[in-house]
From Swiss-Prot:
Stored Pfam families: zf-RING_2 (PF13639), ZNRF_3_ecto (PF18212)
Species assigned in the record: Danio rerio
Enzyme class: transferase
UniProt KW Zinc keyword: yes
Annotated compartments: Cell membrane
Coiled-coil regions listed in the entry: none
CDD domains: RING-H2_ZNRF3
Keyword check for Hydrolase: no
Name of the gene this protein is made from: znrf3
The protein, known as: E3 ubiquitin-protein ligase znrf3
InterPro entries, sorted: Znf_RING, Znf_RING/FYVE/PHD, ZNRF-3_ecto, ZNRF3_Arkadia_E3_ligases, ZNRF3_Znf_RING
Pathway as given in its UniProt record: Protein modification; protein ubiquitination
EC number: 2.3.2.27
Signal sequence range: 1-29
Keywords, alphabetical: Cell membrane, Membrane, Metal-binding, Signal, Transferase, Transmembrane, Transmembrane helix, Ubl conjugation pathway, Wnt signaling pathway, Zinc, Zinc-finger
C-alpha cells in the first residue's frame, strides 16, 4: 500500500470543514432550547415538595427564540383540529405539550404549523412538540414562513421526549421554564452560605487550639503542683508517737517545741487514737495526723485538712508564716510579740506602729499563742507632725534569754506591707502652754499594753523556788494575767521648752484602765477574791463577754449603765505616781490604811512628793501589779468600791504658788522615794529645811540621770525585794526592767528596749514588805494618768467633778486651804469604807501610818487638792 503525501489542497479542506462545524455548532447552540420542568408534590399534611428536571429541545423557525414559562397543559392533536374558536378556550400563561402521531394515523385536518398557531391563539405562551414518532414534522416547522409566531415553538425527541411525556402523564401539577441559553448559576447565590461555613470553621479551629493550649497548661501546672507537693511532703517533718507514763499522749519528734495538733491523742481524719510507734505527719501549720491518712489528702488538695494551710505556699516562702527576728540588727525595727489565743489582748500604740498577726500555734507547754509583728518605723512622710506629748515611745521586744524562741520558722526580713492604720489627730504643736486635753479615744490610741503574756521561762535555767500562795505552786509556762506598758520618753514631756505641764486632764473624766482575765466568769453582781473566781447570782459567763473595755483594754471615762457597772479586773497599783516636769511638778499617790481607825474624809487624796528638783521621765511604775475586779452592781449615783479609780487633772498654777504651798504629811514615816520605794524615817530635826532632798537616795540619783539621758524610765528589780524572801498575797504579780539602748533619732523610736519580766505569786499571809502585791494597788497604765486613790465619801460620784472645780477656786483664793486637804492614806480611807479590807489594806511601804507627822519644809511642788 502506498501512502501519498498530502498536498496543500487537502489542508485547506480540513480548515473549511472545521469552520463549518464551528458555525453549525454555534447555530445549533443558538437554536437549543433548555426546558426546565418543576414538579410540585404535595404531602398529606399539606406541604409541597419541588423537583426540577432539565430537558433539551430545539427552537423551530416557526416561532421566536425567547424565554417562556407557564403551567404544562397536555393537548391532543385532534383537539387542535376544531375550528370553533368558542370551544376549548384556555387562560393565558400556559405551555402546551403536543405528542404527534405517526403520519398514517395523524389526521390531516391541520398541519403541524397550523396546530402551533391554534395553540398560541388559545393563550399558550409556548408550544412543545414530541416528534419522536413523526420526524417529518421537524422539516415542516423549520420552513421559512412569511409570518412567524411571536411565541417560541420547541420540539423534543428521544430520551428527553420520554421524560417529558412521563411527567405530563403522571403529574397533575408541573411547571415548565424555557430558556434559550443554559441557566447560569449566580455567583452570589451560595456566597453567604460559604462565608458562614468559612467563619464557623475558623472559629472552631481557634477554639480547639485554645482548648488544647489550656489543657496542656493545666496539665503542666498540675504536674508541677504535684511535684512541688511531693517535694514539700518529703521535706515535711514526721515523728513517732510516744505515750507518756500517765496516759497523756504527746508526739516525740525532733522539733516538738514548734509542733502542735488539733487533738493531743487522736487523729482528726480517721478519729482513731494514736498508738505508740505510729508515724505522724507534722504539717508546717503545727497540726499532726496519721501519715497514711494525711499524705493522700496533701498530695491531692495541698492544704491542711484542719486549717486549710497551703503547703505549697509554705514551700514557696509565704510571708504570712515567717517570724521576724528582732535580734537581727538589720531588722531591729520589727518586734515579735507572743500573745495567747485565749487571751486576745489588743495592741494600742501611739504614733506610727502597726501590728501584724503572723501565725498561731502552740508553745511547748500546750498553750495556744499568737505571734504578732509590730512595725515601728513606717514612712514618716505619710503622717503629720506629732505632738511632743505622744512622741518618743520606746521600742519593746521580749528578751530571748527569758523568752526562748520556739517558732521553728524561717527567719528573714520583714515581708509585710507597711500599712498605716492610724493617722494622728489635729495635734501638731511642739509646746503646750497648758496641759493638753485628750478624749478617752485618744487615750486608747496613744497607749498600748500587752495582756496575757506567757511566762517567759529562761532557757537552760531551772525554775527557782516555787512561790506558794494558797497552797498552790507557781508553775512556769502557765498563763498569768500581766501587763507590759511602754511609757513615752521624758523628752516628749520635759524636753520641750514652754511646756508647763505634760499631764492631760482627759476632760476631767474619771479614768478606768481596764484589763481582763479571760478564764474567769463574772457578771453584774459578781465579786472577786485572790483566786480570781467570780461568783454571780445571775449567770456564769466569761468575763470577756461582759465588757468590751475589759477585752480590749482601754482608758474609759466614768461609766454608768442601766443595769451594770461591771468592769472586770481593773489593773491597780499603789506605787508612787510621777511628776509632770522638772519644775517640781506635783504628783499624787494612793496607799491603803493600816487600820480602820482614821476619820472619814470626803474628797481628800494622799500626796507623795517626788524628789525636789529631780527631772525624771514619765514611765510605768510597775513595781507591783495585780488584778482586782470592779464588780459594783450599783447605779452611777452610788458610792463606788475601791476598784474605782479617778484621774487627776492637769495641775495648774504658777511656780510661785507651788513654791509657797506646803503639804501636811501624815504618819511617822517620811515621804517615800520614787525610785527605790524606800520610806526614810522622818527626821524631826530637819523640820525647817527645804524639802528638795527629801526621799532621795544614791540609786535614785543615778537611775534618774541615766533615764533622763536615755529618755526612758527605768525600774530595776535589784532594789525591789526578792521574791524568794518576801511573801505575797493575792494574784500573781510581775516585775520588769527596761534596758535602754541608743535611740536612732529625735523623731524615731528606740531600736530595742529589752523588758525582763519576773513573776511572783503572793501568799495569803502578811503582805507588809516592800514591793508587796495587793489587790487595791493601781498601776498607772497611762503615763499621763497621774491620779491617785481618792478617799471617797458617801456622796455620789457625780459630784466629784464639781467638788474639784470648787476646790480649784478655793486654791486660787487661798493657798493655805490647799494644805488642809492633803492627808496620808490612813486618814483618807480609814472610815470611808466600813467593811473589812484585810487584803486591800496593806500599803506598798512596810511601815504603818499611825500618826500625823510634823509639817515638812517648803515643798517643791503644790497640789490641786480637789482631785476629781
Amino acid at each position: 500500500m502506498m501512502i501519498l503525501p498530502r498536498t496543500g489542497f487537502g489542508r485547506g479542506a480540513d480548515s473549511v470543514v472545521l469552520v463549518l462545524l464551528w458555525v453549525l455548532g454555534s447555530v445549533l447552540a443558538k437554536d437549543t432550547a433548555f426546558v426546565e420542568v418543576v414538579l410540585f408534590e404535595s404531602s398529606p399534611n399539606g406541604d409541597y415538595t419541588t423537583y426540577t428536571t432539565g430537558l433539551q429541545g430545539r427552537f423551530s423557525r416557526a416561532g421566536a427564540t425567547i424565554s417562556a414559562e407557564g403551567e404544562i397543559v397536555q393537548m391532543h392533536p385532534l383537539g387542535l383540529c376544531n375550528n370553533n374558536d368558542e370551544e376549548d378556550l384556555y387562560e393565558y400563561g400556559w405551555v402546551g405539550v403536543v405528542k404527534l402521531e405517526q403520519p398514517e394515523l395523524d389526521p390531516s385536518c391541520l398541519t403541524v404549523l397550523g396546530k402551533a398557531k391554534r395553540a398560541v391563539q388559545r393563550g399558550a405562551t409556548a408550544v412543545i412538540f414530541d416528534v419522536s414518532e413523526n420526524p417529518d414534522a421537524i422539516d415542516q416547522l423549520n420552513q421559512v414562513s412569511e409570518d412567524p409566531l411571536k411565541r417560541p415553538v420547541v420540539y423534543v425527541k428521544g430520551a428527553d421526549a420520554v421524560k417529558l411525556m412521563n411527567i405530563v402523564n403522571k403529574q397533575k401539577v408541573a411547571r415548565a421554564r424555557i430558556q434559550h441559553r443554559p441557566p447560569r448559576v449566580r455567583p452570589t447565590e451560595y456566597f453567604d452560605m460559604g462565608i458562614f461555613l468559612a467563619f464557623f470553621v475558623v472559629v472552631s479551629l481557634v477554639c480547639l487550639i485554645l482548648l488544647i493550649k489550656i489543657k496542656l497548661k493545666q496539665r503542666r501546672s498540675q504536674s508541677s503542683m504535684n511535684r512541688m507537693a511531693i517535694q514539700a511532703l518529703e521535706k515535711m517533718e514526721t515523728c513517732k508517737f510516744k505515750a507518756k507514763f500517765k496516759g497523756q499522749r504527746e508526739a516525740s519528734c525532733g522539733a516538738s517545741d514548734s509542733v502542735s495538733s488539733s487533738s493531743t491523742s487522736d487523729c482528726a481524719i480517721c478519729l482513731e487514737k494514736y498508738i505508740d510507734g505510729e508515724e505522724l505527719r507534722v504539717i508546717p501549720c503545727a497540726h499532726r495526723f496519721h501519715k497514711k491518712c494525711v499524705d493522700p489528702w496533701l498530695l491531692q488538695h495541698h492544704t491542711c485538712p484542719h486549717c486549710r494551710h497551703n503547703i505549697i505556699d509554705q514551700k514557696k516562702g509565704n510571708p504570712g508564716a515567717v517570724c521576724l527576728d528582732p535580734g537581727n540588727p538589720v531588722h531591729g525595727r520589727q518586734q515579735r510579740v507572743v500573745l495567747p489565743v485565749h487571751y486576745p489582748g489588743r495592741v494600742h500604740r501611739a504614733g506610727q506602729v502597726t501590728a501584724y498577726p503572723t501565725r498561731t500555734s502552740m508553745d511547748p507547754h500546750g498553750n495556744p499563742i499568737t505571734v504578732l509583728t509590730v512595725d515601728q518605723h513606717p514612712e514618716q512622710g505619710l503622717y503629720p507632725s506629732q505632738s511632743s506629748f505622744i512622741r518618743g515611745y520606746p521600742a519593746l521586744h521580749l528578751d530571748h534569754t527569758l523568752n526562748p524562741h520556739h517558732c521553728g520558722l524561717e527567719h528573714r526580713g520583714p515581708a509585710y506591707p507597711q500599712t498605716h492604720t492610724f493617722k494622728r489627730p489635729k495635734f501638731h504643736g511642739r509646746n503646750f502652754s497648758r496641759a493638753a486635753c485628750f478624749s478617752q479615744y485618744e487615750t486608747m490610741y496613744q497607749h498600748y499594753y500587752f495582756q496575757g503574756l506567757t511566762f517567759p521561762q529562761p532557757e537552760g535555767q531551772p525554775s527557782n523556788g516555787l512561790h506558794k500562795g494558797h497552797n498552790r505552786p507557781f508553775q512556769p509556762g502557765l498563763l498569768y494575767p500581766t501587763v507590759v506598758h511602754m511609757a513615752p520618753a521624758s523628752s516628749s514631756r520635759l524636753g520641750d521648752s514652754g511646756s508647763t505641764s505634760g499631764l492631760s486632764c482627759y476632760h476631767g473624766h474619771r479614768s478606768v484602765c481596764s484589763g481582763y482575765l479571760a478564764d474567769c466568769p463574772g457578771s453584774d453582781s459578781s465579786s472577786s477574791s485572790g483566786q480570781c473566781h467570780c461568783s454571780s447570782s445571775d449567770s456564769m459567763l466569761d468575763c470577756t463577754e461582759v465588757s468590751n473595755q475589759g477585752v480590749y483594754g482601754s482608758c474609759s471615762t466614768f461609766r454608768s449603765s442601766l443595769s451594770s457597772d461591771y468592769d472586770p479586773y481593773v489593773y491597780r497599783s499603789k506605787s508612787p505616781c510621777r511628776g509632770s516636769a522638772g519644775e517640781a511638778g506635783a504628783v499624787f499617790s494612793a496607799a491603803p490604811p493600816a487600820d480602820d481607825t482614821s476619820a472619814p474624809v470626803s474628797g481628800m487624796i494622799d500626796c507623795l512628793q517626788p524628789p525636789g528638783g529631780a527631772c525624771y521621765s514619765s514611765g510605768d511604775q510597775l513595781s507591783n501589779c495585780s488584778l482586782e475586779p470592779n464588780c459594783s452592781n450599783h447605779s452611777s449615783v452610788e458610792t463606788r468600791e475601791l476598784t474605782s479609780t479617778t484621774s487627776a487633772g492637769p495641775l495648774e498654777g504658777n511656780v510661785a504658788e507651788r513654791s509657797h504651798n506646803s503639804v501636811k504629811p501624815c504618819g511617822e514615816q517620811g515621804v517615800a522615794c520614787n525610785c527605790c520605794f524606800e520610806v526614810p524615817k522622818l527626821n524631826l530635826e530637819r523640820k525647817g529645811k527645804e524639802g528638795e532632798d527629801r526621799g532621795h537616795c544614791r540609786w535614785a540619783t543615778e537611775a534618774q540621770a541615766v533615764a533622763s539621758s536615755q529618755n526612758f524610765y527605768s525600774v530595776s528589780t535589784e532594789q525591789l525585794p526578792s521574791p524568794d524572801h518576801v511573801s505575797y498575797d493575792g494574784l500573781p504579780c510581775c516585775f520588769y526592767t527596761e534596758m535602754t539602748v541608743h535611740r536612732g533619732g529625735a523623731n524615731h523610736y528606740a531600736e530595742d528596749c529589752s523588758v525582763n519580766i519576773q513573776y511572783a505569786q503572793t501568799d495569803s499571809d502578811g503582805c507588809m514588805g516592800q514591793g508587796c502585791c495587793e489587790l487595791a494597788q493601781r498601776i498607772p497604765i497611762i503615763p499621763e494618768d497621774t491620779d491617785c486613790e481618792l478617799g471617797l465619801g458617801p456622796e455620789p460620784q457625780t459630784s466629784l467633778l464639781s467638788s474639784r472645780l470648787t476646790t480649784e477656786r478655793e486654791e486660787r483664793t487661798s493657798s493655805e486651804d490647799t494644805c488642809d486637804l492633803f492627808f496620808t492614806s490612813g486618814q483618807c480611807r480609814g472610815q470611808v469604807y466600813q467593811q473589812p479590807q484585810d487584803e486591800e489594806a496593806r500599803a506598798l511601804f512596810s511601815s504603818k501610818c499611825n500618826a500625823v507627822s510634823e509639817t515638812q519644809g517648803s515643798s517643791t511642788s503644790s497640789f490641786d487638792g480637789s482631785g476629781l
